[in-house]
């Protein structure tokens, strides 16, 4: 391809068996991408795994809902910024340089967290805390005024959000580009190579998550947050070096213009021309007579007097068909992002066992370790799916389309939210009978006498949902997109994922209002024992259930349209 740079090393190899030929000559490039992604994910989960605990504890003392909202907003930013990252790569820098720049920005933002964790540097960034009088929030003032503020003060909020924004922008750009960049390394080997790359790419993501949750989260909770946040910083530094050294084996191409720019120009032109045509048509009869299935965009084509080529207009039309699928995935992501926010908050109020009593310092099981059940399940099932299940289904013509797999994932994530709601209902009943005071990360939590292991089902259900919905979503976004818009489509896929995170944060803020009161506990900031978190979980399950029904309609319609366009059975498409 013109303008595309092939690898300097390993470009010529002798003939190999069909099973290994898909990656022959590309193993070094794919390995560098997968290793960089593994390290980046280890750093990402090192930030997010215990962020709620970090902000909820001394000396920050954020309210539990505030800490959860901060994490949801951060994760939303990492996804919402993806289209910008895709535009930056396509229009200005190219994917390889955009990834390098984003890793450097990522590293800069991560430096804020060990600085916030160290007392001396924290005082420099945030100033010394102001002493405040302790008030009895349960007793009203004699004059009838409110005795407590509606929300707890958030210490170090500017420095915290500045670090989160920098990391979020870095993550967003990496996220938008490293997936299609990795697929570019094997795209000339056919769809089978692309499918297998996505499977192992997702496997690497979850291996990084396990290493982070297993080691870094333990260090943060039981040793120190300074060391626990220093390790992710080192991981990103190594990822930067790995990607920098891999330039000699990567297949790269220079920026050739952004599909987003063309997309917005075509959308703007079509809307303006349609509005002008409606004004000229008097009562609108002419527009109705001219209308056809794609008349809105066909008017942009050069053959119809417009300024755009046929290919660009057809690419935008393909994009418009894909967007409803992304919209339908928003509730899925809303539930998915509860795993490290409200699920983690629920964990802190369940009985967490001690795992070490060798020394005088007792170590407790990191609450974030439950997230590993999700990651371990994925690590075990993806190779099984890749090597055994998918080949058998393909030989018998039973491999479901990516949209059908997404629907299955939606069902399992709905079950996860429902299971969390049932557990929270039981927890609230038990905490009224017996309360256990447990210290986690220097913070005393009033927990129910109910083991944390009861959360395993909701994490396992989310893990199963990922195998279906997340992997199939990535595959759908890449394979359904026109070649000229693959980065743009991938960016939009993550953009709508970010909207799901913001929806979760917005819902959490809404139910925290005193008028609703599901998550308001103004007599004890950070304590959810006076809240109704189970209502929130049931609400999420209901929203996902309703969306699943709508998605089934959308997916069946899309598969039928794709089958008519491609001339093949719908079950074998995307």
From Swiss-Prot:
One of its GO terms (biological process) is positive regulation of toll-like receptor 7 signaling pathway. It is found in: Lysosome membrane; Endosome membrane; Early endosome membrane. It catalyses: L-histidine(out) + n H(+)(out) = L-histidine(in) + n H(+)(in); N-acetyl-D-muramoyl-L-alanyl-D-isoglutamine(out) + n H(+)(out) = N-acetyl-D-muramoyl-L-alanyl-D-isoglutamine(in) + n H(+)(in); L-alanyl-gamma-D-glutamyl-meso-2,6-diaminopimelate(out) + n H(+)(out) = L-alanyl-gamma-D-glutamyl-meso-2,6-diaminopimelate(in) + n H(+)(in); glycylglycylglycine(out) + n H(+)(out) = glycylglycylglycine(in) + n H(+)(in). Disruption phenotype: Mice are fertile and look healthy but display impaired cytokine production in dendritic cells. Reduced uptake of L-histidine in brain. CDD domains: MFS_SLC15A3_4 (cd17348). The chain crosses the membrane at residues 42-62, 69-89, 98-118, 161-181, 197-217, 225-245, 319-339, 364-384, 406-426, 460-480, 491-511, 536-556. It is a multi-pass membrane protein. One of its GO terms (molecular function) is dipeptide transmembrane transporter activity. Preferentially expressed in immune tissues, including B-cells and dendritic cells. Highly expressed in macrophages. The modification Phosphoserine is found at residues 281, 299. Keywords: Endosome, Immunity, Innate immunity, Lysosome, Membrane, Peptide transport, Phosphoprotein, Protein transport, Symport, Transmembrane, Transmembrane helix, Transport. InterPro entries: MFS_trans_sf, POT_fam, PTR2_symporter_CS. Belongs to the major facilitator superfamily. Proton-dependent oligopeptide transporter (POT/PTR) (TC 2.A.17) family. Interacts with TASL; leading to TASL recruitment to endolysosome. This is Solute carrier family 15 member 4. It comes from Mus musculus. The gene is Slc15a4.
